[in-house]
Curated annotation (Swiss-Prot):
Protein name (record): Cytosolic carboxypeptidase 1
Lineage, highest ranks first: Eukaryota, Metazoa, Chordata, Craniata, Vertebrata
Cofactor binding: number and manner: Binds 1 zinc ion per subunit.
Localization (cell): Cytoplasm; Cytoplasm, Cytosol; Nucleus; Mitochondrion
Family: Belongs to the peptidase M14 family.
Chain's gene name: Agtpbp1
Amino acid sequence: MSKLKVVGEKSLTNSSRVVGLLAQLEKINTDSTESDTARYVTSKILHLAQSQEKTRREMTTKGSTGMEVLLSTLENTKDLQTVLNILSILIELVSSGGGRRASFLVAKGGSQILLQLLMNASKDSPPHEEVMVQTHSILAKIGPKDKKFGVKARVNGALTVTLNLVKQHFQNYRLVLPCLQLLRVYSTNSVNSVSLGKNGVVELMFKIIGPFSKKNSGLMKVALDTLAALLKSKTNARRAVDRGYVQVLLTIYVDWHRHDNRHRNMLIRKGILQSLKSVTNIKLGRKAFIDANGMKILYNTSQECLAVRTLDPLVNTSSLIMRKCFPKNRLPLPTIKSSFHFQLPIIPVTGPVAQLYSLPPEVDDVVDESDDNDDIDLEVENELENEDDLDQSFKNDDIETDINKLRPQQVPGRTIEELKMYEHLFPELVDDFQDYELISKEPKPFVFEGKARGPIVVPTAGEEVPGNSGSVKKGVVMKERASPKGEEAKEDPKGHDRTLPQQLGGQSRVAPSAHSFNNDLVKALDRITLQNVPSQVASGLNAGMRKDFGLPLTVLSCTKACPHVAKCGSTLFEGRTVHLGKLCCTGVETEDDEDTESHSSTEQAPSVEASDGPTLHDPDLYIEIVKNTKSVPEYSEVAYPDYFGHIPPPFKEPILERPYGVQRTKIAQDIERLIHQNDIIDRVVYDLDNPTYTTPEEGDTLKFNSKFESGNLRKVIQIRKSEYDLILNSDINSNHYHQWFYFEVSGMRPGVAYRFNIINCEKSNSQFNYGMQPLMYSVQEALNARPWWIRMGTDICYYKNHFSRSSVAAGGQKGKSYYTITFTVNFPHKDDVCYFAYHYPYTYSTLQMHLQKLESAHNPQQIYFRKDVLCETLSGNICPLVTITAMPESNYYEHICQFRTRPYIFLSARVHPGETNASWVMKGTLEYLMSNSPTAQSLRESYIFKIVPMLNPDGVINGNHRCSLSGEDLNRQWQSPNPELHPTIYHAKGLLQYLAAVKRLPLVYCDYHGHSRKKNVFMYGCSIKETVWHTHDNSASCDIVEDMGYRTLPKILSHIAPAFCMSSCSFVVEKSKESTARVVVWREIGVQRSYTMESTLCGCDQGRYKGLQIGTRELEEMGAKFCVGLLRLKRLTSSLEYNLPSNLLDFENDLIESSCKVTSPTTYVLDEDEPRFLEEVDYSAESNDELDVELAENTGDYEPSAQEEALSDSEVSRTHLI
C-alpha cells in the first residue's frame, strides 16, 4: 500500500508540475521582458516531455490548455532559445501517440502559426538553420492532417521558401531532408505541384537522386517519394518526359537492382518504380517507357526478384507498370454485336437496343479510334483503397428516399375485361370436380395414406411434346399422341480417335475385347445430331442411344457381374431408357477395389430430402423435345451432358485455395506475348463469325464447339501450344453481357497443362478470385458411370487485361478494358470429349423434359397438376405455367370450398439465362411439391402454387447471359412490359394483376436468381422502414408503422436451410431496382412478401456447407427447404388455428431441428465478403472499375434492432403452433 501511495504522490507531483509550469508560461506571455524566465520554463517543460509519456499525454488531452499556451508563446516571443525549446516540445508531442496528437495540434491552429514562423525566419539573413530544420520537420508531420494545408502554404508563400532552401543548401543533407519531406506534403495539392514544377523542382529532384550509393540512403528515399508525388501532375510528368528522365529512371533502377545484393535498399528501389508509375500515367510517358525498352527491363528484373518474398512489392509494382504500358489491343472480332441476329417485331424508340440498331454500319464498335489518348486518372493508385467507399457512396445514392414512391400503391393497369384473358389459366377457382375420380366421395377428416400412388406413364421418344396439358380427369393421365417418326441417320464424318475412359485420379483396367469397342464408341460419339435416328443398330442399342455411328458394333459380354443390372452383356445398353448407372456394362471392367474404395470413402455430402418419384432424366425424351425447340442459330446438335444427364457427385468440393502469386504469374505470361512475339502461334481454331471455317486437323490442337442449346463460345485463338484465348458471344441484339459460357473441347492429351483464357469478360470482380472453379463434364467419365459435372481447374484468377472495350459497348465510357478469366486444366483421358460451363447448365429442353416426367409420374388422385402455356416467346417457344396443389378430398361443397380458398404462392425463375442455379433451385421446389412426403402433401393442402419456372426461354436456348431476344434485361421491364417484346413478363404480370383483381393476392411472390459476387443463399425483400433507416433519417423511420411480416420467411429459412444466410439479406428498395419483379409486385400488385431469392454461384462461408462450393444437390435442397419454410409460414400467418396430425407435426419439427443442429450461426457478410490474400488481388491495371450494376442489389446489409428481429405481434401470438 505504501508503495502505491508513493507512486501516486509522484505522479500527482509531476502532473501538477507541468500544469504549474504551463500556468507560469501563460503569465510570462503578457510580459515580453521576462525572456530568461520563459527560456527556463520552456526548458523544464521540454525535459518533462522528453522523459515522461504522462506529461505528453497531459498536454494533449481534450480540455487541456497546454497546447494553446505553447502556440501563443511561440507566436509572441522574440527569444530564439524559447522558440527552439517550444519547437522541440512540439516535435516530442507529435512524434509519439500516432496521428491523434498531430490532428490536435492542427485543431489548435498550429499549421498557420508554424507557417508564419517559417516565413518570419526566412527573412533573417542567413536563416537560422535549427529553426528551419525543426519547423519543416513539424510541418511535414502535421501537414497530412490538415485538409487545407496546401492552400495555407501557398497563400503564405511557404512553397518558395522551402524550395529555395533546397536550392541554396544542396549539400546540407540535414536541412534538405525535412525540406524534401515538406515538399512531398505540398505536392499532394495539384496546384502546388504545378507551381513547384514551374520553378524547377523536377530538375532539382533529379540532381539529388542518382545511381547506387551507400551514403545518404535516407535522403535518396525521401527524394524519390517526393519525385513520385510531383510526377502525378500531368504537367510535371510531361516535363520529365521531355527532358528524357524516363530513361534516367530506368537506368538508375537497373543500377540499384544490380548492386543491392542484400536487398537492404528495397524502399529506394520501390521509390524509383513509384516515380515510373506516376510518369506513365500519361500517354507520352507510356510511349517513352516503351521506347526505352522499359517492358523488357522491368520484366527481367521482376523475374529475378520472384525468389525473394520480401521483394514482392517490387514485383507487384513492376507488374502494374507493365500492364499499364502494355499497348491496348483490339478484340479480334469484326463487331462486338452477337454473331447471331434476330429481327425484332418492333424496334424500341430509346435505350441500348435502339442505339444498337441506329449505329451506322461503318462505325467500328469494337474499339474507339482514340482509345489511348486520354491520360489515366491521377488517383489510380488509390483504387483499391477507395473501392469500398465508392461502392458505399453509390449504394447510398441509389436508395429510394421518396416516401410516396416507397408506399405500396396499386397502379391502374389493365381493365377487368382485359384481364379476363387469364381466366382459363385459373380453372381451379371454378372447377367443381364432378368428373374427377377423387379419393373420397364423402367429406371426412384428412388421413394421410402413406405412399398411395396413381399410374405412372413414362413418355417415350415416340410421343409428341404436348404444348398445353389440361387438368387430369378421372384419375387418368393425359392421353398420348404419337409424334412423327424420325428420319434416317446419316453417318458422322467427324470420327475421332478415342481411348478408354479412366477414372479421375486413377487407372482403369480394360478387357482386351472391350478396348477397341469403347474406343470406337467414343470416337463415334463425336456429335449427337438431331438428324441421327435409329436405323442400322436398333437391335443393339437403347432407344436413347440409337444413333448410326457409322461403324458396326461388336456384341460384347460383360467381364464383371453387375448386381444392379438384371441382364447384362448381350447389348450395349439394356432396357428402354438409358440408365447412367449401367454404363459400366459396356465391356469395360468396373473399377478395381482400391478405386472403388477411394470414391466410397470420400466424405459424403449431406443428403437432400429426396422425392420418391422416378428419375426425371430420359435421354430418349430429351432428344424428341430438342427437336421442337426453336433457336436462332437453328442448332442441330445436342451436348452430351444434356443427353446423358447429371447426378451430383458423391463427394464434397471445397472452395479452392488460391495459390500465392498466381495472378502475377499469369500477367507475366501475358506480358511475354509482347516481349517474345516469336513464341506466339496466334492461330484461329474456332470462329462462329466465319461459317466456312473448318477446324484444323493437327493432332496437338484442341477442337472446340458450342453449337448446341445454351452453348456460348464465339471464337478461339491458339496462343501457345497449350494455351488458348476464348471469346464469348454477346447476348443477341446486344453488344455486351459476356459472362455465361458453355462449350465443348476435344482432342486433348493427358499430362498436358492446358491454359484457357476467356478474354472479354466485363464485370470488375468475380468469385473466381475467391475460390470458385468452372464446371467440367467428361464423356469418358460418364461412360464409366460417373455422369456428373465437377469443379475443375487450377491457377484460377480474374484480372483486367489489355483488350480495349469501346465506348459503344461500355455505355459511353471511354478507356475501359475487358477482364480475363484464366484457368488451367490437366485432362485425365486422351481424346476425351469434355464440356466446360460457367455454372451447372440447365437448358429449356431439360425443363420441358422434367415437367413432362413429373406430369406423367404424379398421382392424379392426390396431386392437382396442370401444365399450361402462359404465352409464346419471340422465337415461338412456349413459356410453361405450372399449377400444383392437392386435389380436394371429395367433390362435396366443404372440400371444394377449402380447395378454392387456399392462398396462392407465385414463384418464377430464370429471368436471367446465365443464372442456371435458379433453375436447379426451382427443380428442387418442383420435385418436392410433387413428392409423396407428408410435409409435401400438407403443403399442397395449404396453398395453390402458380409457377413460371423459366421466364426467359429464348435467352436460355440461345446461350444469352442476361437478356432475351429483345436485347433487354427482362427483370427491368416489369413496370411497363411490352406484349410484343417482353411477352413472358407482360403475361406473368397479367396473372398477378388478375389475382389482385379477383381479391386473391398471393401470400408470397418469389423470383429465383443467382448471384455472382456473393456467397450463400439469401433474399432481397421490400421494406419502407428499413429503406428510410438506411438514408440515416432516423426521425422519419421512427414515424413509419410497418408490419414486420416480410422478415418471417427469411428467418424461417435461416433456421431450416443450411445454405441460407440471414445476415446477407436486405430489405432496402433501390432506385435502380424499381422496375424489377420484386419491387413492382410489392409496390404495384401489393404483395408484402415479395422477394428475390439469390443463390450463390460459388459456395458458402457459413453453416453446414462452410468452405464448400455449391452443387446441384445443395441447390435442389434449397428449393425443397423453401417449401418447408412456406409450410411453417402458413402456421404463423393462418387466421385460424392450423392443426395437423401429430405425426406430421413431429415429422417437420424433426426435420427443422436436425437442420438447426448442423447449422452454425450466420456471419455478417459484406459486399466484398472475402479476406485479403497474402498476394494483393489487383483486378485492374490502371483505372477505377466501373460500379457493377449488380452491386446495387447488395444495398442494405442490415443489422436489425432487437425489436425488428422479433416477429410481429400477430405472429408471436401463434408461435405455439410451431
